[in-house]
Amino acid sequence: MWRLSAFLARNPDISRDAFLSRLVDQWAPSAASFGQQRGALKQVVVSLPQDLSGTGLESLFPPVFDALVELWFDSSEDALSTLSQFAGGEDALRLDDAIDPSTSVCFLGEVKPKKPDHDGKSGVRMTVAGHVREGWNIDDAHRYWSEVHPVVAQKVPETWERLSLYQQIHNKNIIGDELVSWLCPYQYYPMSADMGAPTIQQLLAAYDNEQYMAIIRPDEQKFSRPEDMLTFVSDRRLTFN
């Protein structure tokens, strides 16, 4: 499966409630209908931000983004052909007037599940996106991340067993602004991933432990820049198909 992922920050002149209402009540149903009738879109997923106010976690997960939008396809060819249909579509499909173009970004990649959540246990998901470490080419970084890093992670049950979901998205630089300007600006982030856990406390515990810092974190730093990532935390996912 392939996925267009869009980290969306709203236009500052629009309230979060108004932005999410337009996104969920108007845009997402229209986009799902159009993408399936005119293209090969499988589904639209809108993830809503978890309210972390009063939890002490806002400093860890600052509310930079207001929503995460996912457009799912069977192949890169399906994605490219369908996105071209959106680019020439009607005004109701446009979201660019409602977002902050200086912050919002999207990218396209192949989804590679490493620990699927078949039982739907992920009450909370964290989606991240980042860049490869200097000195690595993207293909080699993708290969190491896919083949070696999950093996390393499984050596740390304090992290691996707490996660109900871990999937990688290997993004490819095969689209540009001309295909996604109706949604938000395109910016290439080679690597993105979804991690899930039943609760935010369990998700934090998966990464806030000595074994993660001693074993997994150094491996992440070999091929990527985990200190410089986009992050979005959600406890509500809405699917439109």
Q: What residues fall within each predicted segment?
A:
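Macromolecular interaction modules
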Residues: 1-241
